[in-house]
Amino acid sequence: MEKDPLTIIEQAEDHFIERIAENMHAFGMPSTVGRVLGIIYMNRKPMTLTELSEATGMSKTRMSQVVREMLDANIAEKVFEKGVRKDLYEVEQDYYQTFITLFSATWSKVVSKNKMMHKKLNRELLSVLDEELTPEAEEKVNELLKELKEWLDYYNWLSRLIEFFESEDIFKYVPKP
């Protein structure tokens, strides 16, 4: 017995949605965010919270939280459609742009946190050097300061890498097919 063509289509869409959810999870996003992104993406047009709630089986309250997470991560946006009174949400239809957005957001947070930690540790270690230290302790502080410099160099490099993606210069070296 052959499967109904509509069933095959629905199953294929479900597979796409699940793959998108798994990909989002790789960026540290909850799978529910990935599922909703996939649902809107596969819908190919903006959706309301009610439509999303029905598509996922989640409450409108939970759906509102998920959409807020997506808005905060810049992977969804609220759009206006003439004649529609409810808020509509859409997602980027370009996989490459979605990747750049997620990559940049994820790594920008990491860079920011680590640069703040660098400042704090650097300040603390420099103040320790003003104290009377044993030669071993002074050597250890200097090793840590050197490590901090390498750490800062790494996070500055990551900042440049993020800019490389955001400027889309990446496509000059790794073109889209």
Swiss-Prot record:
<dbReference type="InterPro" id="IPR036388">
    <property type="entry name" value="WH-like_DNA-bd_sf"/>
</dbReference>
<feature type="DNA-binding region" description="H-T-H motif">
    <location>
        <begin position="49"/>
        <end position="73"/>
    </location>
</feature>
<dbReference type="Pfam" id="PF12802">
    <property type="entry name" value="MarR_2"/>
</dbReference>
<keyword id="KW-0805">Transcription regulation</keyword>
<protein>
    <recommendedName>
        <fullName>Putative HTH-type transcriptional regulator YvaV</fullName>
    </recommendedName>
</protein>
<dbReference type="InterPro" id="IPR052362">
    <property type="entry name" value="HTH-GbsR_regulator"/>
</dbReference>
<dbReference type="InterPro" id="IPR000835">
    <property type="entry name" value="HTH_MarR-typ"/>
</dbReference>
<dbReference type="InterPro" id="IPR036390">
    <property type="entry name" value="WH_DNA-bd_sf"/>
</dbReference>
<dbReference type="GO" id="GO:0003677">
    <property type="term" value="F:DNA binding"/>
</dbReference>
<comment type="similarity">
    <text>Belongs to the GbsR family.</text>
</comment>
<keyword id="KW-0804">Transcription</keyword>
<dbReference type="GO" id="GO:0003700">
    <property type="term" value="F:DNA-binding transcription factor activity"/>
</dbReference>
<keyword id="KW-0238">DNA-binding</keyword>
<dbReference type="InterPro" id="IPR026282">
    <property type="entry name" value="MJ1563"/>
</dbReference>
